[in-house]
Regions:
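Glycine-rich NAD(P)-binding loop of the Rossmann-fold in SDR/ketoreductase-type enzymes
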Residues: 88-99, 107, 146-147, 208
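NAD(P)H-binding glycine-rich loop region in Rossmannoid oxidoreductase-like domains
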Residues: 42, 46-95, 103
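Mid/C-terminal beta-alpha module of Rossmann-like enzyme folds, strongest
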Residues: 219-286, 302, 308, 317-318, ...
């Protein structure tokens, strides 16, 4: 984006954890005029004084109008569940997102930046690094992840229609305000003494902190020399093991560390059982296959994003988790629903 005009950047999901951190990063760049999009403008952070386009992304008319007079879209407004809900994932996430892309192309948007995950890549067993364009693999058991892959495929297929497509393969979120992810899912479960190590906790997690997420989107908005389709790993400064992360959470909270270890196939089998029994039990499943999937080996270097976007993560994962845990403690370490409200 190399002209001298103010860049009009629309952020969907602006009232959420990711959208809020994107807005926070955009507002410090004098070249950018951020525009917030969300269902309820009252939930947007009070410090934001820019334009707000209120509406629901499942409304076709709202989608058609949303991207008018916009240069860049940061799409963080996605519906998500950690298990099942295949039909809702199609109607509330996949179809609206693809339609939003089409509307943005018609309205002359120049760049579409999508919040994806490193976990769309095919799993590796030897811990080798996973690059930014690594082949993807549908799981067959986690509808949301599979639809994320479908959106990425749709972006790639439509990247020659005049709007650049930027797929950000984000690491696992950590930071104040996050309620659907690995830390809020694991923390209250540790209190039960029922959480095991997975294969001794030796695999590596791709954590990424709140401020680094915002930085990545801001840099993706203004970067020059991008191809029609781009994919970038966006992770933190290092890749701690599952054992390091869980041990840190236990030390900070006083909750017990796991007392035993199980292999990954056993974790997936127990997750399947809990998902299957969920209709008969209250609340969300104790364990889902998606949680096990997120605890696989995800060493996804940032080198390409550093080279083309100038992205350099700066927040240590321990500091981000410490802040995250303080936020969860203030709420009584709530048991997460693992599914957003429809």
């Amino acid at each position: 984006m190399n002209d001298n005009q103010m860049l009009r950047v629309l952020v969907t999901g602006a009232s959420g954890f990711l959208g809020g951190n994107i807005l926070r990063a955009l507002r410090i760049n004098p070249r950018i005029r951020p525009i917030a999009a969300c269902r309820d403008s009252r939930k947007i952070s009070r410090w934001f004084s820019g334009d707000v386009r209120e509406g629901d992304l499942i409304d076709p008319q709202y989608r058609r109008e949303l991207s008018k007079d916009v240069d860049v879209i940061c799409h963080a407004g996605t519906w998500a569940s950690m298990w099942n809900h295949a039909e809702i994932e199609r109607t509330h996430f996949l179809a609206p997102t693809c339609d939003l892309i089409d509307a943005a192309i018609r309205n002359g948007v120049r760049r579409f930046i999508f919040a994806n995950t490193v976990a769309i890549a095919a799993k590796v067993k030897d811990g080798r690094p996973i690059d930014d364009f690594a082949p993807k693999q549908h799981t067959g058991y986690w509808p949301h992840l599979d639809r994320l892959i479908d959106v990425d495929d749709y972006m790639h297929a439509n990247s020659t229609r005049g709007m650049q497509m930027v797929n950000l393969r984000l690491g696992h979120f950590i930071g104040v305000g996050n309620r659907l992810g690995i830390v809020p899912a694991l923390t209250p479960r540790l209190r039960t003494y029922l959480v095991p190590w997975l294969a001794g906790g030796r695999k590596h997690l791709p954590l990424v902190a709140d401020s680094d997420l915002g930085q990545a989107f801001m840099r993706a908005c203004v970067a020059e020399g991008l191809d029609n389709y781009e994919s970038f790993n966006i992770c933190g400064t290092e890749f701690p093991t599952l054992r390091e992360v869980v041990s840190f959470i236990a030390a900070e909270t006083g909750f017990p560390k796991p007392l035993y270890s199980v292999p990954y196939p056993a974790g997936y089998a127990f997750g399947w059982l809990m998902e299957t029994l969920n209709p008969l039990l209250p609340g969300s499943p104790f364990l889902t296959r998606s949680i096990v999937h997120l605890c696989e080996d995800w060493v996804c270097p940032n080198d390409y994003a550093t080279r083309k976007l100038g992205y350099l993560p700066g927040k240590d994962w321990r500091s981000a988790i410490r802040e995250h845990l303080a936020d969860l403690k203030a709420q009584g370490y709530p048991w997460p629903r693992l599914c957003q409200v429809v």
